[in-house]
Swiss-Prot record:
Family to which this protein belongs: Belongs to the ribonuclease III family.
Broad enzyme group: hydrolase
Protein name: Ribonuclease 3
Keyword Cell membrane appears in the UniProt entry: no
Subcellular localization: Cytoplasm
Domain of life of the organism encoding this protein: Bacteria
Catalytic residues in the record: D42, E114
Binding-site positions, Mg(2+): E38, D111, E114
Name of the encoding gene: rnc
Keyword terms of this UniProt record: Cytoplasm, Endonuclease, Hydrolase, Magnesium, Metal-binding, mRNA processing, Nuclease, RNA-binding, rRNA processing, rRNA-binding, tRNA processing
Residues covered by the DRBM domain: 152-222
GO cellular component, one term: cytoplasm
Names of the cofactor(s): Mg(2+)
Length: 223
């Protein structure tokens, strides 16, 4: 069964699958969708990550903790987790959203991750939901340092590779679509130690490169 595969990827087995099904349902696909779950999951995620950072960095000030949390809970990071779980294969979208490639859109992917966090909370309680967030984020949290939250993904990737005496990444524009005022850039990022080619998407070349670098970092720092 498809949902069995997804639950293995998530590392959590639902007692009530209805919660998971609702978390996977976008508002374009019906009335019983994941919007309310996303609202709740956002709060649980912020608390879980805030708690982990508070305990991990006893000397960090409020500003540093806030910046690190913002880095970890932002849309791009959640979308990377969603792709790792392959959520695009399991989400239920309306016909229009499906046709426009909604299953690839970062906002939809990130909302789905937050909805799943809420679904776990409803299924098993707060302690389990927090533990699950910590499990998903354990490698990202291990790499996090107070000053790093202010650095962009390209800088962090460069420093990660330099610190291990590895060659720097190469970026290349794959294509540019749209009119001058509304363009979408696709950029590849390659590093020597990984065979995989990472594709970043953004409204500018810089944003696309940052997106690709973020994906590489996630690959390097998650199991």
């Amino acid at each position: 069964m498809q949902l069995e595969r997804l639950q293995k990827k998530l590392g959590y087995q639902f007692t009530n699958l209805d919660y998971l099904l609702q978390a996977l349902t976008h508002r374009s696909a019906g009335a019983k969708n994941n919007e309310r779950l996303e609202f709740l999951g956002d709060s649980i995620l912020n608390f879980a990550i805030g708690k982990a950072l508070f305990e991990k960095f006893p000397k960090a000030n409020e500003g540093e903790l806030s910046r690190m949390r913002a880095t970890l809970v932002r849309e791009q990071t959640l979308a990377i987790l969603a792709r790792k779980f392959g959520l695009g294969e399991y989400m239920k979208l309306g016909a229009g959203e499906l046709k426009s490639g909604g299953y690839r859109r970062e906002s939809i992917l990130s909302d789905c991750v937050e909805a799943i966090i809420a679904a776990i909370y409803l299924d098993a309680g707060m302690d389990k939901a927090i533990a699950q967030v910590h499990l998903w984020y354990q490698d990202l949290l291990a790499e996090m340092k107070p000053g790093d939250a202010q650095k962009d993904p390209k800088t962090r990737l460069q420093e990660f590779l330099q610190g291990r005496k590895l060659p720097l990444p190469t970026y290349e524009v794959l294509n540019i679509k749209g009119e001058a005022h509304n363009q979408t850039f696709k950029v590849t990022c390659k590093i020597e130690m990984l065979e995989e080619i990472f594709i970043g998407i953004g409204t500018s070349r810089r944003k696309a490169e940052q997106n690709a670098a973020e994906q590489v970092l996630a690959k390097l720092t998650t199991k």
